[in-house]
Amino acid sequence: MSDVRVIIQRDSEREERVVTTGTTAADLFPGERTVVAARVGGELKDLAYEVKDGEEVEPVQISSEDGLNILRHSTAHVMAQAVQELFPEAKLGIGPPVKDGFYYDFDVAKPFTPEDLKAIEKKMQEIQKRGQRFSRRVVTDEAAREELADEPYKLELIGIKGSASNDDGANVEVGSGELTIYDNLDAKTGDLCWKDLCRGPHLPTTRNIPAFKLMRNAAAYWRGSEKNPMLQRIYGTAWPSKDELKAHLDFLAEAEKRDHRKLGNELDLFSIPDQIGSGLAVFHPKGGIVRRVMEDYSRRRHEEEGYEFVYTPHATKGKLFETSGHLDWYADGMYPPMQLDEGVDYYLKPMNCPMHNLIFDARGRSYRELPLRLFEFGTVYRYEKSGVVHGLTRARGFTQDDAHIYCTREKMADELDKTLTFVLNLLRDYGLTDFYLELSTKDPEKFVGSDEVWEEATETLRQVAEKQGLPLVPDPGGAAFYGPKISVQAKDAIGRTWQMSTVQLDFNLPERFDLEYTGPDGSKQRPVMIHRALFGSIERFFAVLLEHYAGAFPAWLAPVQAVGIPIGDAHVEYLQKFAAEAKKKGLRVEVDSSSDRMQKKIRNAQKQKVPFMVIAGDEDMTAGAVSFRYRDGSQENGIPLDEAIAKIAKVVEERTQV
């Protein structure tokens, strides 16, 4: 046997090793049970891959991003095998790994039931214990079609080899190169147990799957298109250990408690009636209070920062979106046109920026007016497929806190710095404090403007972001075609990351709208345009805060800041007078004068997550005082009336949590 020289790469360490022909990647890492694959020359390979002379080989740990994807993809195969053993008529769709888990689509006569999922999970456990070996083999297109003749969706994937999309998961099955099938082989006999069209890589055996659980099933269109058949999708999750699986399930349970759709109903904040339509919310009185307070505070802070408020209509002639380019770039996200005025197309607006450009262009502008900061709570409408609409976080009609800033090239860096600082400070005011920034840069295949302008703008954004002292994560190629952007990513109380604010440079719209201002020398010059959405949308930010606080808003945002709870009927009037005085100070106070017993009233207030429960009995009336009960059950007694009102007002004014 001839010698083979390979380089073992581990982080920054490189080790040259001489092995014999036929050595596999697994042979390079004996006893390392957490290694599930290898990266060879930058490509992921199974551990069964035979290394070649001169190759660089890096172990892939199961806990790494690639390792988790391999674990979850292999578990998806086990699930598909289990489904076809239990439901032989089931036809296979696609089964990719996704964030924190995996799914597989099936064409079956009836939707899966909860009992079916339990049976499938039990069968998966049996397959896992069998230790079946994942074995890769290369096949021709013709051979693949012959082997998979009974799988119509696999045949379709073979036909699109080379153009498979990452968006619909097809690229996990077929790529631009050779076709491969993965066989699940019996650990003892080597007999074929099951097979699937797949690019891989996979775990060595099913025994390498430490912990998994099936989560739910849902309907899904084949490859995400409503024109295609409806399939049944089963979601699952898989982790490197049982402890990590348990931690994930605990996290999901906590997230479910905080689900804004659930809390919105329990706290009577908003609803999404079927009679109106998916993705179109109505805010109830209590939710309306929270939203108004959010908007009022934002409006005040914007005024302090020199923004000017504007209002624009909800619909416009289609010609405006031809000028802006939205009909070229964004038509699929817009609602269909309405033909009015003798056949003129009108559209519901998906964005506010074209109308703000018309405001800028309504008269001549001088450099002395710049920066011009236009701001609007502008309601927009975007067509989202029903499968992606999700409560308030992915809606079809929503209100953006939308600003567009027009400034000179010389003032661009200063304005970006001020804008980002303002954005972060305002988010902190609402209680979000854990951030990192993401810098989205040019997609070399899709951009307008010169390379020089992009480089200057990107470097300016980078410097502005670095000044904040926050982690800066690159997003290569992630920018829109019209300019680079900074995204503010915020973590909530349970560690989830939400994209909040964006600060986006735009080289496209000033050109399309021929926007100009008169410079100091009298010449006409093109302004720099900055898009800035701080909340993203009011509805989405409302949902994020609702989940962040688990419905227990700080007093300044709470729809009811204090509720009076009389110990008996004789104390109702006393608390009503207290409430009247508190309302004069601008506080939102109610008195529970129902016939419920006091303990029931306290439970009701706790369920509604009211910050202050103000309790009064005979002793309180005699002393001219009240008692405070807080959300955590603690209590403070004998607080004089004026002091009690002042204390609530102070907590509201300082925007602190109690």
Swiss-Prot record:
Coiled-coil intervals: none
This protein's name: Threonine--tRNA ligase
GO biological process: threonyl-tRNA aminoacylation
Cofactor(s) needed by this chain: Zn(2+)
Textual note on the cofactor: Binds 1 zinc ion per subunit.
Record keywords: Aminoacyl-tRNA synthetase, ATP-binding, Cytoplasm, Ligase, Metal-binding, Nucleotide-binding, Protein biosynthesis, RNA-binding, tRNA-binding, Zinc
Main localization category: cytoplasm
Region ranges (Catalytic): 259-554
HAMAP family referenced in this protein's UniProt entry, alphabetically: Thr_tRNA_synth (MF_00184)
General function of this protein: Catalyzes the attachment of threonine to tRNA(Thr) in a two-step reaction: L-threonine is first activated by ATP to form Thr-AMP and then transferred to the acceptor end of tRNA(Thr). Also edits incorrectly charged L-seryl-tRNA(Thr).
Gene: thrS
Enzyme class: ligase
One Gene Ontology CC term in the entry: cytoplasm
Ligand binding (Zn(2+)): 353, 404, 531
Assembly: Homodimer.
